[in-house]
Amino acid sequence: MEERESNVLGTAPIGRLMLKLAVPAVAAQFINMLYNIVDRIYIGHIPEAATLALTGLGVTFPIITLVSAFAAFAGQGGAPLAAIQLGAGKKDQAERILGNSLALLLMTAAVLTVGFSAFKEPILRAFGASDATIGYASSYIGIYLLGTVFVQLALGLNTFISAQGKAMTAMLSVLIGAVLNIVLDPIFIFVFQWGVRGAALATILSQAVSACWVLAFLCCPHSILRIRRAYVRPDPRVMGKIAGLGVAPFIMQSTESLVTVVLNTGMQTYGGALYVGSITIIQSIMQMIVMPTQGITQGVQPIMSYNYGAKNYRRVRQTFKRLLAVTMAVTCSAFVMVALIPGVLARIFTPEQELIQLVSRVMPLFFGGIWAFGAQMACQSTFMALGQARTSLSLALLRKVILLVPLALILPRVTGSVMGIYAAEPIADILASATTLTLFLSQRKKLLPTEKDAPKG
C-alpha cells in the first residue's frame, strides 16, 4: 500500500496531481500565515495602544523569522532528500533522514530558546525597539520563545508529511493550530486583557497542538515515513546532507530578519515612526501574497523530487512548466490587487487614517515588481527539489542580500527621500527574477536531459 501511494507521484496525471498536492499546501501556508497575521490584526486594534503595540510586535519579526528559518533548515533540508530516496525505492534511508531532521530540530530549539532569552532586550533594541516600544516587544517575544520547540517541530516535521504526498494531512496539521489561535487570540487579548502577552500565549499553545498532531501522524502506521527511535540518533553524514540542502531555505527565511531590520531602521531615520508602521503593514501584506505562492511550490516539490529520483526527467519538465505558469498567474494577480485596493488592505491592520493614507500611497510602488517574483519562486523551488544546494543558495542570496539590502541602504541616501527605500523592493524583484530564470534555462538541459540530449551508452 505504501509503495502504491508513493508511486502516485510518478504515475498520476500531472495537472490533477498538482491540484491535489498544491491546493492543500496553499491552504496550509495561508493558514500558517494566520498565526502572525491574526496577532497583528488584533494587536493593531488594542484600545489606546494600537500603534505602539503593533510597532513593538513588528520589532520582534526578525527573531520570529529566525526561529522559523531554523525549522526550514532541518525540515526543508531533509524532506526533499527523503522524497528522492523514496523515489529511488530506499525507504530506510528516507526514514533515517527523517530521524536526523527531528534530532536537528530538537537541538536547534534548545539553543535558540536559551540564546534569545538570555540576550532578549539588547537584541530587540538592535532590531529597532525604542523606549516606547521595548515593553511590548519584550512581553511578546519572552512568552513566544518558551514555545520555540513547538514551532520547530510543527513547521519542520510537517514538510515530511508533504514529502510523501499526503498534502491534506499536512494542511490539517496547520489548520488545527491556526483555528485554535484565531479563537484564543481575542479571548486572551481582550476578554482576559492580557494584551500582547495573550497574543503570544495563544500562538505557542496553538503551535503545541500542531506539533503533537504532526508527531502522532509520523509515528502511526498510516504514514509512509515513520519516526523510528534508532534513526533519531544523530548521524554526522546524514546531518551534513540535510544541512547542505537546508542552507538555502534557511537563508531565504533568515535574510527576512536582515531585511526587516534594514527597512525598520531606514524608515525611522528618513521618515519617522509613522513610516515604520507603514512598512510593518506592507510586510504583512507581502507575507499574505508570498506564503500562498510558497505553498504552491512546496506542494509541487514532491512530484519533481520523486520523478527526479526515478530519472523520469520528462515528467519533471512538464511539472516545472505548469508550476511556472501558476506562480506567474498568482503574482501578476497580486500586482493588480495592490494597485487597485491598497486602502482596503491597509484597513485590515489599522483604523488610523493617517497611516492608511500613507500605506495606500506607497504600496503600489513597493509591489511594483511582484508580478515577476513568480518566476524566481518557481525556479528556486525546482533547484531545491532537484537537490541543487549550491545553486539554491546562490539564488537565495541574490534577491535579498545582494540586491535588496544594498538598494535599501543606498537609494534613500542618493535620493534624499524615504521613498528610495520603498523603491528598492521592485528593483530587486525584477532583477532577481530575470537572473534566476535565465540561470535555470541555461542549466535545464544538463539537469533534465531529453532523450536526444542524454549521453549515449
Task: Identify the function of each model-found stretch.
Residues L19, L34-Y35, P62, A74, ...:
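Residue-level signal for transmembrane alpha-helical positions in Major Facilitator Superfamily
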Residues L54-V114, V151-A170, S278-P342, F373-S392:
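Small-residue-rich hydrophobic transmembrane alpha-helices
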Residues F30, L34-T55, L124-D131, I187-W194, ...:
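Helix-terminus/linker motif at the lipid-water interface of multi-pass membrane proteins
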Residues L9-A49, P62-G77, L81, Q85, ...:
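N-terminal transmembrane alpha-helices
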Residues K20-D39, I143, G177, S206-S210, ...:
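Transmembrane helical elements of multi-pass membrane transporters/channels
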Residues T51-P62, S138-I141, A200, A273-M288, ...:
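Small-residue hotspots at the loop-to-helix junctions and early N-terminal turns
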Residues M1-A22, A82-V149, V191-V247, M304-G369, ...:
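Short alpha-helical transmembrane segments in multi-pass integral membrane proteins
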Residues Y144-S162, A170-A178, A199-C212, Q294-T297, ...:
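Short runs within selected transmembrane alpha-helices of multi-pass transporters and secretion channels
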